[in-house]
């Protein structure tokens, strides 16, 4: 029997189909919000889980999923976050976007990004060493400590440009941090400690 890679943190998902898909590949426990609903009792439980085990928010890459993520982000600021691109969460037939539709490679990459590594496990369950990705490890300590400014965003055309939305969509998808609008983008990039060097490298391909 193949041994699945264990995820110590509790993964927060929207429904049981998301749970089932994750458990196909990983030894993990999930907390289901029950679709788009999340209340104060859920948030209190998630706070306790974060204190005891840590949580990874892994909601769907759609409006409701981002709404739930933002609510949890405000209530549990230390929570980790995993993201799927919209294409990775698209069903083969009709239906809405969801973690339940993602294949192993997409799930594995999303979880690896949480820990700053290349991959959590291979498809057969063998654990891999979680090494920092090359673009992050090459960044100096000084750069990591420097937060992005509104001027930086403007210089990359992420705000105040005719195609700013498309630029943000491209950048956020490549960095796997979930879409952020013009008001959110600076906070989102700084939260994930994204540097100007990383943005430059990504936007070269825009």
Swiss-Prot record:
Names of required cofactors: Mg(2+)
UniProt: Mg(2+) 1 binding residues: 14, 60
Pfam families, per database record: DUF4093, Toprim
CDD domains per the UniProt record, alphabetical: TOPRIM_RNase_M5_like
Catalytic reaction list: Endonucleolytic cleavage of RNA, removing 21 and 42 nucleotides, respectively, from the 5'- and 3'-termini of a 5S-rRNA precursor
Listed GO MF terms: metal ion binding; ribonuclease M5 activity; rRNA binding
Binding site for Mg(2+) 2: 60, 62
Subcellular location: Cytoplasm
GO biological process: rRNA processing
One cellular component (GO) term of this entry: cytoplasm
Function statement: Required for correct processing of both the 5' and 3' ends of 5S rRNA precursor. Cleaves both sides of a double-stranded region yielding mature 5S rRNA in one step.
Family: Belongs to the ribonuclease M5 family.
Cross-referenced NCBIfam families: 5S_RNA_mat_M5
PANTHER family: RIBONUCLEASE M5
Name of the protein in question: Ribonuclease M5
Originating species: Lactococcus lactis subsp. lactis (strain IL1403)
Species classification: Bacteria, Bacillati, Bacillota, Bacilli, Lactobacillales
Gene name for this UniProt entry: rnmV
